[in-house]
Amino acid sequence: MVDPGHNFALHTAAPAKAMLAYMNPEDQAKIIDSITYTRYNENTIITKRSFVKNLKETREKGYATDLAEEIINLHCVACPIFNHKLEPIASIWITGPSDRLQPERFDEIGEIIGESALKISRRLGYEPELNGHSAYE
């Protein structure tokens, strides 16, 4: 159970990872360098190197995940939302108990969330076709 208003750490939260993965490299590096990689449990990413690898995988998949990295038995899948400048400005996600939101379904769920994120992004002026940028392929 997550208490209302709970703030997840940047290195554990799928919505944060979804945005960070698509930030410009300079801003991304500043944020990554500022993180204290606190261990919450055995699933937590605890090194900068592992976190950077996770962000690279996020870009490759088009969605970010949280595999019970802060709260045991809680998974999350998230996709970024972009503005007209191709900047990630928000995320959309689904969170659930790990027995119901299982890794085998992450690709399917990521695709569904990605479709919604693309619709929202387009409403904000995001036009990936004009410059070859797309997180939702």
Predicted regions and their residues:
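Amphipathic alpha-helical effector-binding/dimerization core
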Residues: 1-34
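Intrinsically disordered, low-complexity segments enriched in polar/charged residues with Gly/Pro
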Residues: 6-7, 37, 65-68
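Generic alpha-helical structural context detector
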Residues: 17-21, 56, 118, 122
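Generic secondary-structure transition motif, activating predominantly at the C-termini of alpha-helices
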Residues: 23, 35-36, 55, 59
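Cysteine/selenocysteine-centered motifs that mediate thiol-based redox chemistry or coordinate metal-sulfur cofactors
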Residues: 30-31, 35-36, 117-137
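Intrinsically disordered, low-complexity polar/acidic regions
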Residues: 40-41
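Extended hydrophobic
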Residues: 44-117, 135-137
